[in-house]
Amino acid sequence: MLKKLSVHIRGFEKDAIKAPLFIGIEAVCELFLPLLMAGIIDDGINGDGGMAYIWKAGLGMLALSVLSLYCGMTAAKSSAVASQGLGRNLRSEMFSKIQDFSFADIDRFSSASLITRLTNDVNTIQLTTMMCLRMLVRAPVQLISALVVCLVMNARLTLVIVVVIPVMCLLLWLIMRSCEKLFTRFQEKIDGLNNTVQENLIGIRVVKAFVRANHERAKFKKSNDELRDAGLAAVMRVILISPVMMLAMYASILGVMWFGGGFVARGELLPGELYAFFSYIVQVLMSVLMVGVCLLMLTRAVACAKRVVEVLEAEPDIADSPESRGRALPESRGKVEFRGVNFKYSASGSGDDVLHGIDLTVEPGQFVAVVGGTGTGKSTLVNLIPRFYDVTQGQVLVDGLDVRDYPLAELRSRIGMVLQTNVLFSGTVRENLLWGRADATEAELVQAAKNAQAYDFIMAMPQGFDTRLDQGGVNVSGGQKQRLCIARAMLRHPAILILDDSTSAVDSATEAEIRRSFSENLKDTTVIIIAQRISSVRYADKIVVLDDDHIAAEGTHEELMQTSDIYREIYQSQQEGAIDNG
Protein backbone atom coordinates (compact mmCIF):
# COMPACT_ATOMS: atom_id res chain seq x y z
CA MET A 1 0.00 0.00 0.00
CA LEU A 2 2.79 2.41 0.94
CA LYS A 3 4.60 1.38 -2.25
CA LYS A 4 1.66 2.77 -4.23
CA LEU A 5 2.13 6.11 -2.49
CA SER A 6 5.90 6.20 -3.02
CA VAL A 7 5.43 7.27 -6.66
CA HIS A 8 3.89 10.50 -5.39
CA ILE A 9 7.21 11.67 -3.93
CA ARG A 10 8.22 12.84 -7.42
CA GLY A 11 10.07 16.14 -7.43
CA PHE A 12 11.65 15.30 -4.08
CA GLU A 13 13.53 12.12 -5.01
CA LYS A 14 16.95 13.66 -4.27
CA ASP A 15 15.99 14.44 -0.69
CA ALA A 16 14.41 11.00 -0.30
CA ILE A 17 17.80 9.49 -1.28
CA LYS A 18 19.94 11.94 0.71
CA ALA A 19 18.14 11.29 4.00
CA PRO A 20 18.94 7.55 4.28
CA LEU A 21 22.42 8.05 2.79
CA PHE A 22 23.46 10.61 5.40
CA ILE A 23 21.76 8.77 8.25
CA GLY A 24 23.77 5.67 7.25
CA ILE A 25 27.00 7.68 7.45
CA GLU A 26 25.92 9.02 10.86
CA ALA A 27 25.34 5.46 12.12
CA VAL A 28 28.80 4.36 10.92
CA CYS A 29 30.43 7.37 12.63
CA GLU A 30 28.74 6.50 15.91
CA LEU A 31 29.96 2.92 15.55
CA PHE A 32 33.60 3.99 16.05
CA LEU A 33 33.04 6.20 19.10
CA PRO A 34 32.85 3.36 21.68
CA LEU A 35 36.04 1.80 20.25
CA LEU A 36 37.92 5.09 20.63
CA MET A 37 36.57 5.49 24.16
CA ALA A 38 37.67 1.93 25.00
CA GLY A 39 41.16 2.82 23.76
CA ILE A 40 41.26 5.92 25.98
CA ILE A 41 40.34 3.79 29.04
CA ASP A 42 42.59 0.79 28.32
CA ASP A 43 45.57 2.44 26.58
CA GLY A 44 45.41 6.08 27.65
CA ILE A 45 44.42 5.76 31.31
CA ASN A 46 45.25 2.17 32.31
CA GLY A 47 47.95 1.60 29.69
CA ASP A 48 51.12 3.27 28.49
CA GLY A 49 49.58 5.64 25.94
CA GLY A 50 49.30 8.55 28.34
CA MET A 51 47.99 11.99 27.46
CA ALA A 52 49.31 11.80 23.92
CA TYR A 53 47.02 8.87 23.19
CA ILE A 54 44.10 10.49 25.02
CA TRP A 55 44.48 13.68 22.95
CA LYS A 56 44.79 11.74 19.72
CA ALA A 57 41.77 9.54 20.43
CA GLY A 58 39.82 12.51 21.83
CA LEU A 59 40.38 14.55 18.66
CA GLY A 60 39.27 11.55 16.62
CA MET A 61 36.08 11.32 18.68
CA LEU A 62 35.49 15.05 18.24
CA ALA A 63 35.93 14.83 14.46
CA LEU A 64 33.57 11.85 14.25
CA SER A 65 31.02 13.63 16.46
CA VAL A 66 31.08 16.74 14.25
CA LEU A 67 30.71 14.63 11.10
CA SER A 68 27.92 12.65 12.76
CA LEU A 69 26.16 15.88 13.76
CA TYR A 70 26.40 17.28 10.22
CA CYS A 71 25.10 14.05 8.67
CA GLY A 72 22.28 13.86 11.21
CA MET A 73 21.17 17.44 10.54
CA THR A 74 21.36 16.92 6.77
CA ALA A 75 19.35 13.71 7.03
CA ALA A 76 16.76 15.42 9.24
CA LYS A 77 16.38 18.30 6.79
CA SER A 78 16.21 16.01 3.74
CA SER A 79 13.66 13.69 5.33
CA ALA A 80 11.52 16.68 6.32
CA VAL A 81 11.66 18.12 2.78
CA ALA A 82 10.87 14.74 1.19
CA SER A 83 7.97 13.99 3.55
CA GLN A 84 6.51 17.48 3.23
CA GLY A 85 6.79 17.15 -0.55
CA LEU A 86 5.02 13.80 -0.45
CA GLY A 87 2.25 15.33 1.69
CA ARG A 88 1.90 18.26 -0.69
CA ASN A 89 1.68 15.99 -3.74
CA LEU A 90 -0.85 13.68 -2.10
CA ARG A 91 -3.07 16.57 -1.03
CA SER A 92 -2.86 18.16 -4.48
CA GLU A 93 -3.68 14.94 -6.32
CA MET A 94 -6.47 14.01 -3.92
CA PHE A 95 -8.02 17.47 -4.21
CA SER A 96 -7.75 17.31 -7.99
CA LYS A 97 -9.38 13.87 -7.98
CA ILE A 98 -12.21 15.11 -5.75
CA GLN A 99 -12.93 17.90 -8.25
CA ASP A 100 -13.68 15.16 -10.80
CA PHE A 101 -16.03 13.30 -8.46
CA SER A 102 -19.72 13.22 -9.23
CA PHE A 103 -22.33 13.97 -6.61
CA ALA A 104 -22.73 10.21 -6.18
CA ASP A 105 -18.99 9.83 -5.48
CA ILE A 106 -19.14 12.57 -2.85
CA ASP A 107 -22.17 10.89 -1.28
CA ARG A 108 -20.35 7.55 -1.25
CA PHE A 109 -17.27 8.83 0.59
CA SER A 110 -19.02 11.65 2.55
CA SER A 111 -17.50 15.11 2.72
CA ALA A 112 -16.37 14.65 6.36
CA SER A 113 -14.43 11.50 5.45
CA LEU A 114 -12.80 13.21 2.46
CA ILE A 115 -11.68 16.09 4.70
CA THR A 116 -10.17 13.61 7.18
CA ARG A 117 -8.39 11.72 4.40
CA LEU A 118 -7.07 14.94 2.87
CA THR A 119 -5.73 16.27 6.18
CA ASN A 120 -5.36 13.81 9.07
CA ASP A 121 -4.54 10.73 6.99
CA VAL A 122 -2.03 12.54 4.78
CA ASN A 123 -0.39 14.12 7.85
CA THR A 124 0.03 10.65 9.40
CA ILE A 125 1.64 9.34 6.20
CA GLN A 126 3.83 12.44 6.04
CA LEU A 127 5.08 12.04 9.64
CA THR A 128 5.69 8.32 9.16
CA THR A 129 7.68 8.98 5.99
CA MET A 130 9.87 11.53 7.77
CA MET A 131 10.62 9.13 10.63
CA CYS A 132 11.09 6.02 8.50
CA LEU A 133 13.45 7.66 5.99
CA ARG A 134 15.82 7.96 8.94
CA MET A 135 15.00 5.14 11.34
CA LEU A 136 14.50 2.33 8.83
CA VAL A 137 18.03 2.91 7.50
CA ARG A 138 19.73 3.78 10.77
CA ALA A 139 18.29 0.81 12.67
CA PRO A 140 19.51 -2.00 10.34
CA VAL A 141 22.93 -0.39 9.78
CA GLN A 142 23.42 0.19 13.50
CA LEU A 143 22.05 -3.23 14.48
CA ILE A 144 24.16 -5.27 12.07
CA SER A 145 27.36 -3.23 12.55
CA ALA A 146 27.12 -3.27 16.34
CA LEU A 147 26.42 -7.02 16.40
CA VAL A 148 29.43 -7.71 14.15
CA VAL A 149 31.72 -5.65 16.43
CA CYS A 150 30.32 -7.44 19.50
CA LEU A 151 31.00 -10.83 17.90
CA VAL A 152 34.57 -9.80 17.11
CA MET A 153 35.14 -8.50 20.65
CA ASN A 154 33.62 -11.47 22.49
CA ALA A 155 31.42 -13.99 20.74
CA ARG A 156 30.31 -15.75 23.96
CA LEU A 157 29.11 -12.51 25.57
CA THR A 158 27.25 -11.63 22.38
CA LEU A 159 25.06 -14.71 22.86
CA VAL A 160 23.21 -12.82 25.61
CA ILE A 161 21.84 -10.28 23.15
CA VAL A 162 21.45 -12.81 20.33
CA VAL A 163 19.01 -14.74 22.53
CA VAL A 164 17.05 -11.62 23.52
CA ILE A 165 16.57 -10.12 20.01
CA PRO A 166 14.29 -12.89 18.59
CA VAL A 167 12.13 -12.70 21.73
CA MET A 168 11.79 -8.93 21.31
CA CYS A 169 10.93 -9.29 17.62
CA LEU A 170 8.29 -11.95 18.34
CA LEU A 171 6.62 -9.79 20.99
CA LEU A 172 6.68 -6.78 18.64
CA TRP A 173 5.09 -8.80 15.85
CA LEU A 174 2.31 -10.05 18.11
CA ILE A 175 1.51 -6.51 19.26
CA MET A 176 1.62 -4.99 15.76
CA ARG A 177 -0.50 -7.75 14.29
CA SER A 178 -3.53 -6.61 16.27
CA CYS A 179 -3.01 -2.87 15.75
CA GLU A 180 -3.91 -2.32 12.07
CA LYS A 181 -7.65 -2.97 12.45
CA LEU A 182 -7.71 -0.84 15.58
CA PHE A 183 -6.06 2.08 13.75
CA THR A 184 -8.48 1.72 10.82
CA ARG A 185 -11.39 1.88 13.26
CA PHE A 186 -9.78 4.91 14.93
CA GLN A 187 -9.59 6.77 11.59
CA GLU A 188 -13.24 5.94 10.90
CA LYS A 189 -14.23 7.39 14.27
CA ILE A 190 -12.33 10.58 13.36
CA ASP A 191 -14.53 10.71 10.24
CA GLY A 192 -17.60 10.43 12.45
CA LEU A 193 -16.49 13.20 14.78
CA ASN A 194 -15.62 15.47 11.86
CA ASN A 195 -19.04 14.83 10.34
CA THR A 196 -20.76 15.76 13.61
CA VAL A 197 -18.77 18.99 13.93
CA GLN A 198 -19.27 19.87 10.26
CA GLU A 199 -23.04 19.38 10.45
CA ASN A 200 -23.23 21.46 13.61
CA LEU A 201 -21.23 24.38 12.22
CA ILE A 202 -23.12 24.41 8.92
CA GLY A 203 -26.46 24.33 10.70
CA ILE A 204 -25.54 26.41 13.77
CA ARG A 205 -28.27 28.97 13.08
CA VAL A 206 -30.89 26.21 12.95
CA VAL A 207 -29.47 24.69 16.14
CA LYS A 208 -29.85 28.00 17.95
CA ALA A 209 -33.24 28.77 16.44
CA PHE A 210 -34.69 25.44 17.63
CA VAL A 211 -32.79 25.48 20.95
CA ARG A 212 -31.13 22.16 20.11
CA ALA A 213 -27.74 22.88 21.66
CA ASN A 214 -28.18 20.17 24.32
CA HIS A 215 -29.12 17.62 21.65
CA GLU A 216 -26.03 18.59 19.65
CA ARG A 217 -23.86 18.33 22.76
CA ALA A 218 -25.18 14.82 23.37
CA LYS A 219 -24.54 13.85 19.74
CA PHE A 220 -21.02 15.27 19.90
CA LYS A 221 -20.39 13.50 23.22
CA LYS A 222 -21.39 10.19 21.64
CA SER A 223 -19.01 10.67 18.68
CA ASN A 224 -16.28 11.97 20.97
CA ASP A 225 -16.65 9.02 23.36
CA GLU A 226 -16.53 6.57 20.45
CA LEU A 227 -13.32 8.21 19.24
CA ARG A 228 -11.88 8.04 22.76
CA ASP A 229 -12.77 4.34 23.07
CA ALA A 230 -11.27 3.54 19.66
CA GLY A 231 -8.15 5.52 20.56
CA LEU A 232 -7.82 3.77 23.92
CA ALA A 233 -8.22 0.35 22.31
CA ALA A 234 -5.32 1.13 19.97
CA VAL A 235 -3.19 2.84 22.62
CA MET A 236 -3.61 -0.03 25.11
CA ARG A 237 -1.90 -2.30 22.59
CA VAL A 238 0.72 0.26 21.68
CA ILE A 239 1.78 1.01 25.26
CA LEU A 240 2.78 -2.63 25.67
CA ILE A 241 5.76 -1.93 23.41
CA SER A 242 7.66 0.31 25.83
CA PRO A 243 7.63 -1.96 28.92
CA VAL A 244 8.32 -5.06 26.81
CA MET A 245 11.29 -3.39 25.12
CA MET A 246 12.61 -1.92 28.38
CA LEU A 247 12.35 -5.29 30.13
CA ALA A 248 14.31 -6.94 27.34
CA MET A 249 16.88 -4.13 27.35
CA TYR A 250 17.46 -4.24 31.11
CA ALA A 251 17.61 -8.05 31.07
CA SER A 252 20.29 -7.85 28.37
CA ILE A 253 22.31 -5.24 30.27
CA LEU A 254 22.13 -7.27 33.50
CA GLY A 255 23.24 -10.35 31.60
CA VAL A 256 26.17 -8.51 30.03
CA MET A 257 27.17 -7.04 33.43
CA TRP A 258 27.01 -10.47 35.09
CA PHE A 259 28.95 -12.38 32.49
CA GLY A 260 31.11 -9.42 31.39
CA GLY A 261 32.26 -8.79 34.96
CA GLY A 262 33.43 -12.39 35.12
CA PHE A 263 35.36 -12.00 31.87
CA VAL A 264 37.09 -8.85 33.18
CA ALA A 265 37.91 -10.56 36.50
CA ARG A 266 39.50 -13.47 34.62
CA GLY A 267 41.40 -11.13 32.32
CA GLU A 268 39.54 -12.25 29.23
CA LEU A 269 38.14 -8.74 28.64
CA LEU A 270 39.56 -5.29 29.37
CA PRO A 271 37.50 -2.68 31.28
CA GLY A 272 37.44 -0.36 28.27
CA GLU A 273 36.26 -3.21 26.06
CA LEU A 274 33.45 -3.97 28.52
CA TYR A 275 32.43 -0.28 28.34
CA ALA A 276 32.45 -0.45 24.54
CA PHE A 277 30.48 -3.69 24.69
CA PHE A 278 27.84 -1.98 26.84
CA SER A 279 27.64 0.85 24.31
CA TYR A 280 27.15 -1.56 21.42
CA ILE A 281 24.54 -3.55 23.33
CA VAL A 282 22.61 -0.30 23.87
CA GLN A 283 22.96 0.50 20.14
CA VAL A 284 21.62 -2.94 19.22
CA LEU A 285 18.67 -2.70 21.58
CA MET A 286 17.90 0.88 20.55
CA SER A 287 17.93 -0.28 16.94
CA VAL A 288 15.33 -2.93 17.73
CA LEU A 289 13.33 -0.28 19.62
CA MET A 290 13.54 2.04 16.59
CA VAL A 291 12.27 -0.77 14.38
CA GLY A 292 9.40 -1.22 16.81
CA VAL A 293 8.51 2.48 16.69
CA CYS A 294 8.69 2.43 12.89
CA LEU A 295 6.49 -0.65 12.70
CA LEU A 296 3.99 1.03 15.01
CA MET A 297 3.90 4.15 12.85
CA LEU A 298 3.77 2.06 9.69
CA THR A 299 0.80 0.11 11.04
CA ARG A 300 -1.20 3.30 11.43
CA ALA A 301 0.22 4.74 8.20
CA VAL A 302 -0.91 1.64 6.27
CA ALA A 303 -4.45 2.12 7.58
CA CYS A 304 -4.32 5.76 6.45
CA ALA A 305 -2.67 4.86 3.14
CA LYS A 306 -5.52 2.48 2.28
CA ARG A 307 -8.00 5.32 2.73
CA VAL A 308 -5.89 7.74 0.68
CA VAL A 309 -5.32 5.22 -2.13
CA GLU A 310 -9.05 4.47 -2.12
CA VAL A 311 -9.64 8.10 -3.12
CA LEU A 312 -6.75 8.30 -5.59
CA GLU A 313 -7.77 5.08 -7.35
CA ALA A 314 -11.49 5.79 -7.34
CA GLU A 315 -12.88 6.04 -10.84
CA PRO A 316 -15.44 8.86 -10.97
CA ASP A 317 -18.92 7.60 -11.78
CA ILE A 318 -19.23 10.41 -14.31
CA ALA A 319 -16.38 11.19 -16.68
CA ASP A 320 -15.76 12.05 -20.31
CA SER A 321 -16.38 9.02 -22.50
CA PRO A 322 -13.66 8.08 -25.03
CA GLU A 323 -16.19 8.74 -27.81
CA SER A 324 -16.68 12.35 -26.67
CA ARG A 325 -13.11 13.32 -27.50
CA GLY A 326 -12.87 14.97 -30.88
CA ARG A 327 -16.57 14.54 -31.59
CA ALA A 328 -18.26 17.24 -33.68
CA LEU A 329 -20.73 18.92 -31.32
CA PRO A 330 -24.09 20.38 -32.30
CA GLU A 331 -24.71 24.12 -32.33
CA SER A 332 -25.59 25.47 -28.90
CA ARG A 333 -29.32 26.25 -29.09
CA GLY A 334 -30.70 25.16 -25.73
CA LYS A 335 -32.99 22.27 -26.61
CA VAL A 336 -33.45 19.70 -23.82
CA GLU A 337 -35.08 16.28 -24.16
CA PHE A 338 -35.82 13.50 -21.69
CA ARG A 339 -36.55 10.16 -23.37
CA GLY A 340 -37.85 7.31 -21.21
CA VAL A 341 -35.76 8.42 -18.24
CA ASN A 342 -35.65 6.34 -15.07
CA PHE A 343 -33.36 7.28 -12.20
CA LYS A 344 -32.50 5.94 -8.77
CA TYR A 345 -29.77 7.13 -6.41
CA SER A 346 -28.60 3.68 -5.38
CA ALA A 347 -25.43 2.80 -7.29
CA SER A 348 -26.23 -0.89 -6.93
CA GLY A 349 -29.47 -0.46 -8.84
CA SER A 350 -31.59 -1.48 -5.86
CA GLY A 351 -34.25 0.72 -4.31
CA ASP A 352 -37.17 2.62 -5.80
CA ASP A 353 -36.98 4.94 -8.79
CA VAL A 354 -36.87 8.63 -7.92
CA LEU A 355 -37.91 9.36 -11.51
CA HIS A 356 -39.74 6.92 -13.75
CA GLY A 357 -40.81 7.06 -17.38
CA ILE A 358 -39.93 10.73 -17.90
CA ASP A 359 -40.58 11.97 -21.44
CA LEU A 360 -40.23 15.72 -21.85
CA THR A 361 -39.09 18.14 -24.55
CA VAL A 362 -38.03 21.73 -23.88
CA GLU A 363 -37.61 23.76 -27.06
CA PRO A 364 -34.89 26.41 -27.48
CA GLY A 365 -35.86 29.71 -25.86
CA GLN A 366 -38.79 28.24 -23.92
CA PHE A 367 -39.56 29.22 -20.34
CA VAL A 368 -40.47 25.95 -18.62
CA ALA A 369 -41.47 25.57 -14.99
CA VAL A 370 -41.40 22.41 -12.87
CA VAL A 371 -43.75 22.18 -9.89
CA GLY A 372 -44.81 19.45 -7.51
CA GLY A 373 -44.82 18.42 -3.90
CA THR A 374 -41.76 17.92 -1.73
CA GLY A 375 -39.78 14.83 -2.68
CA THR A 376 -41.28 14.40 -6.14
CA GLY A 377 -37.88 14.59 -7.88
CA LYS A 378 -37.87 18.18 -9.20
CA SER A 379 -34.24 18.92 -8.31
CA THR A 380 -33.20 15.44 -9.41
CA LEU A 381 -34.75 16.07 -12.83
CA VAL A 382 -32.74 19.23 -13.53
CA ASN A 383 -29.55 17.74 -12.04
CA LEU A 384 -29.57 15.20 -14.87
CA ILE A 385 -29.18 17.94 -17.51
CA PRO A 386 -25.61 19.05 -16.56
CA ARG A 387 -24.92 15.38 -15.78
CA PHE A 388 -24.42 15.74 -12.05
CA TYR A 389 -25.91 12.24 -12.04
CA ASP A 390 -26.33 9.73 -14.87
CA VAL A 391 -29.72 8.29 -15.71
CA THR A 392 -30.39 4.69 -14.71
CA GLN A 393 -32.31 4.13 -17.93
CA GLY A 394 -33.18 6.24 -20.96
CA GLN A 395 -31.54 9.37 -22.36
CA VAL A 396 -31.14 13.05 -21.60
CA LEU A 397 -30.26 15.05 -24.72
CA VAL A 398 -29.03 18.61 -25.13
CA ASP A 399 -29.34 19.97 -28.65
CA GLY A 400 -30.04 16.46 -29.93
CA LEU A 401 -26.95 14.81 -28.43
CA ASP A 402 -26.94 12.53 -25.40
CA VAL A 403 -25.32 14.36 -22.47
CA ARG A 404 -23.05 11.32 -21.95
CA ASP A 405 -21.52 11.97 -25.37
CA TYR A 406 -20.46 15.53 -24.50
CA PRO A 407 -17.15 16.41 -22.89
CA LEU A 408 -18.28 17.46 -19.40
CA ALA A 409 -16.64 20.88 -19.63
CA GLU A 410 -18.39 21.63 -22.94
CA LEU A 411 -21.78 20.41 -21.69
CA ARG A 412 -21.65 22.46 -18.51
CA SER A 413 -20.37 25.54 -20.33
CA ARG A 414 -23.73 25.62 -22.14
CA ILE A 415 -25.63 25.63 -18.85
CA GLY A 416 -26.02 28.28 -16.17
CA MET A 417 -27.34 26.91 -12.90
CA VAL A 418 -28.53 28.37 -9.62
CA LEU A 419 -28.71 25.51 -7.17
CA GLN A 420 -31.27 25.07 -4.43
CA THR A 421 -28.54 25.74 -1.88
CA ASN A 422 -27.11 29.14 -2.76
CA VAL A 423 -23.34 29.00 -2.42
CA LEU A 424 -21.07 32.03 -2.24
CA PHE A 425 -17.35 31.89 -1.56
CA SER A 426 -15.14 34.02 0.64
CA GLY A 427 -13.88 36.91 -1.49
CA THR A 428 -15.34 40.04 -3.04
CA VAL A 429 -18.73 40.36 -4.71
CA ARG A 430 -16.87 40.85 -8.00
CA GLU A 431 -14.85 37.64 -7.55
CA ASN A 432 -18.01 35.67 -6.82
CA LEU A 433 -19.84 37.02 -9.87
CA LEU A 434 -16.86 36.35 -12.14
CA TRP A 435 -17.26 32.65 -11.41
CA GLY A 436 -19.94 32.91 -14.09
CA ARG A 437 -17.44 34.12 -16.70
CA ALA A 438 -13.92 35.11 -15.73
CA ASP A 439 -13.37 37.38 -18.77
CA ALA A 440 -16.58 39.41 -18.35
CA THR A 441 -16.23 43.18 -18.76
CA GLU A 442 -17.27 45.71 -16.14
CA ALA A 443 -20.30 46.65 -18.22
CA GLU A 444 -21.40 43.00 -18.45
CA LEU A 445 -20.90 42.62 -14.71
CA VAL A 446 -23.10 45.63 -13.99
CA GLN A 447 -25.76 44.49 -16.47
CA ALA A 448 -25.92 41.00 -14.93
CA ALA A 449 -26.33 42.53 -11.47
CA LYS A 450 -29.11 44.79 -12.75
CA ASN A 451 -30.88 41.90 -14.49
CA ALA A 452 -30.86 39.95 -11.20
CA GLN A 453 -32.07 43.00 -9.24
CA ALA A 454 -28.82 42.93 -7.28
CA TYR A 455 -27.18 46.15 -8.49
CA ASP A 456 -28.83 48.52 -6.01
CA PHE A 457 -27.93 46.61 -2.87
CA ILE A 458 -24.40 45.91 -4.18
CA MET A 459 -23.80 49.63 -4.67
CA ALA A 460 -25.18 50.28 -1.18
CA MET A 461 -22.39 48.12 0.26
CA PRO A 462 -19.28 49.92 1.61
CA GLN A 463 -17.03 49.02 -1.35
CA GLY A 464 -19.67 48.11 -3.92
CA PHE A 465 -18.50 45.23 -6.12
CA ASP A 466 -15.26 45.08 -4.12
CA THR A 467 -17.02 44.45 -0.80
CA ARG A 468 -15.74 41.25 0.78
CA LEU A 469 -18.15 38.43 1.49
CA ASP A 470 -17.56 36.13 4.43
CA GLN A 471 -17.37 32.36 3.94
CA GLY A 472 -20.70 31.14 2.63
CA GLY A 473 -21.94 34.72 2.18
CA VAL A 474 -23.15 34.94 5.78
CA ASN A 475 -22.94 38.74 5.74
CA VAL A 476 -25.72 39.07 3.14
CA SER A 477 -29.38 38.13 3.47
CA GLY A 478 -30.94 35.04 1.93
CA GLY A 479 -32.66 37.08 -0.78
CA GLN A 480 -29.46 38.98 -1.60
CA LYS A 481 -27.55 35.72 -1.78
CA GLN A 482 -30.10 34.31 -4.25
CA ARG A 483 -29.89 37.40 -6.45
CA LEU A 484 -26.08 37.28 -6.49
CA CYS A 485 -26.23 33.62 -7.55
CA ILE A 486 -28.72 34.49 -10.31
CA ALA A 487 -26.45 37.32 -11.52
CA ARG A 488 -23.51 34.93 -11.57
CA ALA A 489 -25.45 32.46 -13.73
CA MET A 490 -26.76 35.17 -16.08
CA LEU A 491 -23.25 36.57 -16.58
CA ARG A 492 -22.41 33.30 -18.29
CA HIS A 493 -24.89 33.96 -21.15
CA PRO A 494 -25.82 30.26 -21.14
CA ALA A 495 -27.93 28.50 -23.72
CA ILE A 496 -29.81 26.86 -20.83
CA LEU A 497 -30.50 28.56 -17.50
CA ILE A 498 -31.70 26.37 -14.62
CA LEU A 499 -33.11 27.96 -11.47
CA ASP A 500 -33.79 25.51 -8.66
CA ASP A 501 -36.17 27.28 -6.27
CA SER A 502 -33.90 30.31 -6.61
CA THR A 503 -36.33 33.11 -5.82
CA SER A 504 -37.94 31.67 -2.69
CA ALA A 505 -36.28 34.26 -0.42
CA VAL A 506 -37.16 37.37 -2.46
CA ASP A 507 -40.39 39.32 -2.27
CA SER A 508 -43.03 39.09 -4.99
CA ALA A 509 -42.25 42.51 -6.47
CA THR A 510 -38.54 41.73 -6.83
CA GLU A 511 -39.36 38.31 -8.25
CA ALA A 512 -41.61 39.94 -10.85
CA GLU A 513 -38.76 42.28 -11.85
CA ILE A 514 -36.38 39.33 -12.20
CA ARG A 515 -38.95 37.51 -14.33
CA ARG A 516 -39.40 40.60 -16.52
CA SER A 517 -35.62 40.80 -16.90
CA PHE A 518 -35.57 37.19 -18.09
CA SER A 519 -38.15 37.89 -20.79
CA GLU A 520 -36.27 41.00 -21.99
CA ASN A 521 -32.66 39.81 -21.79
CA LEU A 522 -32.85 36.04 -22.17
CA LYS A 523 -35.07 35.73 -25.23
CA ASP A 524 -32.81 33.12 -26.83
CA THR A 525 -32.06 31.30 -23.58
CA THR A 526 -33.96 28.21 -22.48
CA VAL A 527 -35.06 28.82 -18.89
CA ILE A 528 -36.06 25.93 -16.63
CA ILE A 529 -37.29 27.01 -13.23
CA ILE A 530 -38.32 25.01 -10.19
CA ALA A 531 -40.63 26.97 -7.92
CA GLN A 532 -43.04 26.47 -5.07
CA ARG A 533 -45.17 29.54 -5.77
CA ILE A 534 -47.61 29.36 -8.66
CA SER A 535 -47.22 33.13 -9.04
CA SER A 536 -43.60 32.47 -10.04
CA VAL A 537 -44.50 30.15 -12.90
CA ARG A 538 -47.99 30.97 -14.14
CA TYR A 539 -46.63 32.89 -17.15
CA ALA A 540 -44.30 30.06 -18.22
CA ASP A 541 -44.59 28.67 -21.76
CA LYS A 542 -44.97 25.22 -20.24
CA ILE A 543 -45.52 23.99 -16.69
CA VAL A 544 -44.54 20.42 -15.80
CA VAL A 545 -46.28 18.86 -12.79
CA LEU A 546 -44.37 16.07 -11.04
CA ASP A 547 -46.14 13.65 -8.73
CA ASP A 548 -44.22 10.92 -6.93
CA ASP A 549 -41.76 9.76 -9.61
CA HIS A 550 -43.48 10.69 -12.87
CA ILE A 551 -44.90 13.58 -14.88
CA ALA A 552 -48.54 13.89 -13.90
CA ALA A 553 -49.37 16.72 -16.31
CA GLU A 554 -47.90 19.44 -18.47
CA GLY A 555 -49.26 22.52 -20.18
CA THR A 556 -49.85 26.22 -19.61
CA HIS A 557 -51.34 27.59 -16.40
CA GLU A 558 -54.76 27.90 -17.98
CA GLU A 559 -54.65 24.39 -19.43
CA LEU A 560 -53.56 22.81 -16.16
CA MET A 561 -56.25 24.62 -14.22
CA GLN A 562 -58.72 22.79 -16.45
CA THR A 563 -57.05 19.38 -16.67
CA SER A 564 -54.83 18.72 -13.62
CA ASP A 565 -56.28 18.06 -10.18
CA ILE A 566 -52.81 18.18 -8.60
CA TYR A 567 -51.97 21.57 -10.10
CA ARG A 568 -55.37 22.95 -9.22
CA GLU A 569 -54.96 21.74 -5.63
CA ILE A 570 -51.55 23.44 -5.33
CA TYR A 571 -52.96 26.67 -6.75
CA GLN A 572 -56.02 26.70 -4.50
CA SER A 573 -54.01 25.94 -1.36
CA GLN A 574 -51.73 28.90 -2.11
CA GLN A 575 -54.68 31.17 -2.80
CA GLU A 576 -56.29 30.19 0.50
CA GLY A 577 -52.99 30.78 2.29
CA ALA A 578 -52.72 34.23 0.72
CA ILE A 579 -56.27 35.09 1.86
CA ASP A 580 -55.58 33.84 5.41
CA ASN A 581 -52.37 35.88 5.60
CA GLY A 582 -54.19 38.91 4.25
Roles of regions detected by a PLM:
Residues 20, 24-32, 66-73, 125-128, ...:
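Hydrophobic alpha-helical transmembrane bundles that constitute the permease/transmembrane domains
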Residues 45, 50-54, 63, 149-163, ...:
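Helix-loop-helix
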Residues 98, 220, 308, 338-340:
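Conserved catalytic Walker-motif region of ABC-type ATPase nucleotide-binding domains
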Residues 1-13, 114:
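A short amphipathic helical element positioned immediately N-terminal to and/or at the very start
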Residues 10-14, 79, 100-104, 120-133, ...:
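An intracellular "coupling" helix at the cytosolic face of ABC transporter transmembrane type-1 domains
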Residues 329-582:
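ABC-type nucleotide-binding domain
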Residues 13-74, 78, 151-156, 267-271:
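Transmembrane helix-loop-helix hairpins at lipid-water interfaces of multipass membrane proteins
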